[in-house]
Amino acid sequence: MKLGIVGLPNVGKSTLFNSLTKAGAESANYPFCTIDPNVGVVTVPDERLNLLGDFYKSKKVTPAVIEFVDIAGLVKGASKGEGLRNQFLANIREVDAIVHVVRCFEDSNVVHVDGNIDPLRDIETINLELVFSDLEILERRIAKVTKTARMDKEAAKELTFLEKVKAHLEDGQLAITLETENEDEDAWLATYNLLTAKPVIYAANVAEDDIADDGANNAHVQAVREYASKQNSEVFVICAQIEEEISELDEDERKMFLEDLGLTESGLEKLVRASYHLLGLMSFLTAGEDETRAWTIKIGTKAPQAAGKIHTDFERGFIKAEVVNYQDLLDCGSYAGAREKGLVRMEGKDYVVQDGDVILFRFNV
């Protein structure tokens, strides 16, 4: 999974990116690597994985990962050539979802580019740049499809749909809020890879005083939540300044620091939870002496397709899936014990994998 972090200058975007990636870097349980200065890979915190690794005394424990991209150049006027237009467009088109950092704190020492704090204005500023970029794509596609629409019924249908999407964007709406009418429209929309069709998570960056109650008394946060609800987007409250402090601590110190603030989870954990929920993701597990590993899949994925995440041969030659819930396995004390109690099941190709399933795939190629 790849998430692109965007935001106007001085909203805390780079602080958040650096804090999240550094937190992953310095935690012994969650290794981190840097691809380049603007890309970081952070492992997904998952207590189940560590418990299973201890259970099997695994030589290796491999968590799921999220790739964060710090999207540069997204400023007012970017669609007209301001900022680093080509760079940000190339980067943002590759991500699965957008994390939009919005400033919800007052601080006279940190000047806002527009002079005052207004997160909804900031959101609209960036959305407008994304809309302009999408309109360019649609206009190029319309020009191409128009050439064959008179002689090709399918092209004519697509042209009608393109005009529908264009009108939606010109009305100030995002592509993600467009209601499609059939599978053809879904397929066409997917091929355009529009920026405004990507799911969005709003990171409401607040002052330290607002973090304990999750921004309940912050009018800016409430405005962002109301806006996001109309897009079926996720909102999580974070204090980038606190995350920066947390990133300097080891695991034990981090837990104590969070407890002192009245928090049960870090910003990274909040973001992971919001991302999985928004994108409809979950994890199944494979476990053994050699390796215990988490695999990220879409909710609703069937066993053969889950097997294909490990290797294409597993999906192609799928026979059965040997399945046990991770908690049942731990409670029984051994795999044999879980089998004796009838908790290990043999599932076929129509089985829908559940979050926390520990699976051994049977296959033959």
Task: Identify the meaning behind each predicted range.
Residues 85, 89-191, 202, 236:
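Long, charged N-terminal accessory/stalk domains
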Residues 2-6, 17, 146-352, 359, ...:
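C-terminal-of-GTPase-core extension/linker across diverse P-loop GTPases
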Residues 38, 71-72, 102, 141, ...:
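Fold-independent oxyanion-binding glycine-rich loops
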Residues 1-111, 139-140:
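Conserved G1/Walker A P-loop phosphate-binding module
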Residues 42, 74-80, 115-129, 149-154, ...:
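Flexible beta-alpha connector loops of hexameric P-loop NTPases
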Residues 22-23, 48-49, 72-75, 103-109, ...:
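Conserved nucleotide-binding/hydrolysis micro-motifs of P-loop NTPases
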Residues 23-31, 38-40, 48-51, 80, ...:
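Glycine-rich, flexible loop/turn motifs
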Residues 32, 46-49, 62-68, 82-96, ...:
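Amphipathic alpha-helical transducer elements in NTP-driven molecular machines
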